[in-house]
């Protein structure tokens, strides 16, 4: 693309009349939305992949019903990712997951109408088929990258095949969460929600593939969950959904709640600020009441897993974690530090006010 950089007649906007060039800002929005969406999906998978590794190292006697000690149990804890729909977004997402997380090719499967067109991914070892039900039944995390018009039929195909513990991650923004929950008959669904700022700087570039764009430090900063740089704003309820999804993953393996809290602290709060050393009490640590009401915690037995959380409810209503994270700026800072570290960017404490900008959640859909 560098060879064409100075050839104005070959640029996208060359043939657009001057009076219509106002709409070119939509191109930047589209690209920003795709990059930010893929980055958040990659962070989500990185957290799940790391959690899977941590779970493999836990003693097998955590819960009486956990009785398998063989290699099959270890394999069962590996993260497997399925993608339904492999248009432009699906391909970019696949490449980001393979190169950034990274997800091993053998742990990634794609279902698309034209699997024969994905020759390059097949060469890498990714299984590409046209079998939505098979991919849905195999995956622990399932991404929906199809068109809104295709979604009802796809849901009909896969709803009876989905494991209760599978986390469905939907990029189909036109379908509200309650409707998606009904179509899939499934509660473990995460759907990021975005809105756009009116005034913004287009930081997203033009021609780079998303994995390459995510090597740019400015773009990495722009994708931070608490940052509105670049004009694409994530609904911070996504962070809550991620945390409760991780808890559900532990619950599916019958891990006691006390051990889950240790895992979450190790997974989400490994980075520390200088203030954590000078003032240890300011360093955030997760507690039971951060995720459940005090009345429920009082009646929770010590050697029990967390209850199963409906992720659609988590994203649509106020939760104990909503109140906790909004009242704890240091927790937001720690999550921002971790997010940047996942993408290979180390940021200083002085940069945090520009990275971890507190943004109010979007108006929830009904």
Curated annotation (Swiss-Prot):
Its EC number is 1.-.-.-. Keywords: Oxidoreductase. InterPro entries: NAD(P)-bd_dom_sf, P5C_Rdtase_cat_N. Pfam families: F420_oxidored. One of its GO terms (molecular function) is oxidoreductase activity. It comes from the Eukaryota. The keyword Oxidoreductase applies. Belongs to the pyrroline-5-carboxylate reductase family. Probable oxidoreductase. This is NADP-dependent oxidoreductase domain-containing protein 1. The gene is Noxred1.
